A protein has these predicted regions:
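Conserved N-terminal beta-strand and adjoining loop/helix that marks the start
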Residues: 1-15
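NUDIX/MutT-family hydrolases
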Residues: 88-120
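Short loop/turn microsegments at loop-to-beta-strand junctions
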Residues: 3-4, 42, 94
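Conserved Nudix-box catalytic region and its N-terminal flanking loop in Nudix hydrolases
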Residues: 14-49, 53
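A short coil-to-beta-strand element that immediately follows conserved catalytic motifs
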Residues: 58-67
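Active-site-adjacent beta-strand/loop module that shapes the phosphate/pyrophosphate-binding cleft
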Residues: 10, 66-88, 95-97, 101-103
């Protein structure tokens, strides 16, 4: 299963992180928002769709940072920027926040996501 995840910066240079719902899978972990690719969909289109569905935000994807594999899940991490936060709406996460790269390390991340953060400039 392919999953596209977005490491997206706001105009101040902070990364948007989402706190997963306490009742769903992997509860109370912080994540780079994204989701599963649908049949026939490119990873970039998947990521843009997921950000609209989950956060009501338009994003501009700049590049693929890395790809990781955990069990049968292949995560593709893209870096980019949020076009505008004015219409931000939380639809899936219990909370979202904007964090500096150093502050992202302090969050409860999925195993291995700290290594993804290490790759950021």
């Amino acid at each position: 299963m392919d999953v596209a995840c977005g490491i997206m910066y706001d105009k101040a240079g902070n990364i948007l992180m989402g706190l997963r719902d306490s009742r769903g899978p992997n509860p109370n972990y912080w994540e780079f928002p994204g989701g599963k690719r649908e049949d026939g969909e490119s990873l970039e289109t998947c990521l843009q769709r997921e950000w609209m569905e989950e956060l009501n935000l338009h994003i501009e994807i700049e590049y693929l940072l890395c790809t990781t594999t955990n069990n049968n899940v292949i995560c593709h991490f893209f870096v980019g920027k949020i076009i505008d936060t004015e219409n931000l709406r939380i639809n899936v996460h219990q909370y979202i926040g904007f964090y500096s790269k150093n502050d992202v390390y302090k969050l409860r991340l999925f195993e291995g996501d700290d290594k993804v953060v290490d790759m950021l400039k």
